[in-house]
From Swiss-Prot:
HAMAP family attached to this UniProt entry: AIRS (MF_00741)
Domain of life: Bacteria
GO biological process annotation, one example: adenine biosynthetic process
Keywords: ATP-binding, Cytoplasm, Ligase, Nucleotide-binding, Purine biosynthesis
GO molecular function, a single term: ATP binding
Protein name: Phosphoribosylformylglycinamidine cyclo-ligase
Pathway noted in the entry: Purine metabolism; IMP biosynthesis via de novo pathway; 5-amino-1-(5-phospho-D-ribosyl)imidazole from N(2)-formyl-N(1)-(5-phospho-D-ribosyl)glycinamide: step 2/2
SUPFAM superfamilies with a match to the protein in the record: PurM C-terminal domain-like, PurM N-terminal domain-like
Record-linked Pfam families: AIRS, AIRS_C
Reaction equation(s) it catalyzes: 2-formamido-N(1)-(5-O-phospho-beta-D-ribosyl)acetamidine + ATP = 5-amino-1-(5-phospho-beta-D-ribosyl)imidazole + ADP + phosphate + H(+)
Amino acid sequence: MSVRYEQAGVNLEAGYEAVSRMKRHVARTMRPEVMTGLGSFGAMIDLGSMNMKHPILVSGTDGVGTKLKLAFALDQHDTIGIDCVAMCVNDCLVHGAEPLYFLDYIATGKAEPAKLERIVAGVAEGCVQAGCALVGGETAEMPGMYPDGEYDIAGFAVGVVEKEDLLDGSTIQDGDVVLGLASSGVHSNGFSLVRHIVEAQGLHYTDEIAMLDTTLGNALLLPTRIYAEAAKAAISTGKVQGMAHITGGGFYENVPRMLPGGLGITFDASSWPSLPVFDWLEQVGNISKQEMFNVFNMGIGYMITVRAEDVELVEAALERVGETAHRIGKVESRPGIRISGVDQ
């Protein structure tokens, strides 16, 4: 033990204990392509063992934003890692990639082994859901950088897809149908607005909310869905033209990212069930419907675009993995995102 280092605020023994606690969770995530164990300077992946003709790597990086503030307030850290994995992996999925591996970065003012284990257990659970290996990460203890009990988390995901199967939305055309997959709730975006509403109303995250049938904190901390199994099922049909992950910026910012120039989509907001958490935020926060769709996912976390004649085939593939797809929109030969009942 370095006494002077500990006097400076860094407890090496706590860091070692945290890593030791993490190992059993990391072990759950391993894939046969992984060549190194936890603790190696760099993680190595054997792409050759996948026998692909022309593999394309697809990467994504993200964090969880101010949703962390809720985890701090409620001392609930078990699912925030799932959020981190979801935010990165879902972005890779839209290009047709199979998630391969994930790395995390956790920064805190003081290493607390039990808390760090809970966070990484969530990361590992997210990796299991996504089918990717947690091959490494960094836990940085930085005295003076964060308030007591707080931390930040970010992640980095890499997936792989055959070049000929790469999805970039370029084949989407007028008349295509957009299928929407349900979100679990707010996911990991818009929490600065959520927190503003809660604080302005003088509410607490432990308050029971009748409309939500649970506490406010429980409803808001539901982890972001990981759409790996659904995306794989849809892609297996060979009929997917493009996909989108609905994150910060809601419908208006994320949907255009999958569309070729000159095309737009008209959505029917009545074509999927409304989630109580969004109804509550809209009412209590006095937020316009248009702004809600510009900030939140509004109950749709992932979109899949297919030809009209292929809708039933893709729906059936999704149903086989327990996923219900909603026919929520149609591609049109005029730019822009339009939502019936919202845009006037």
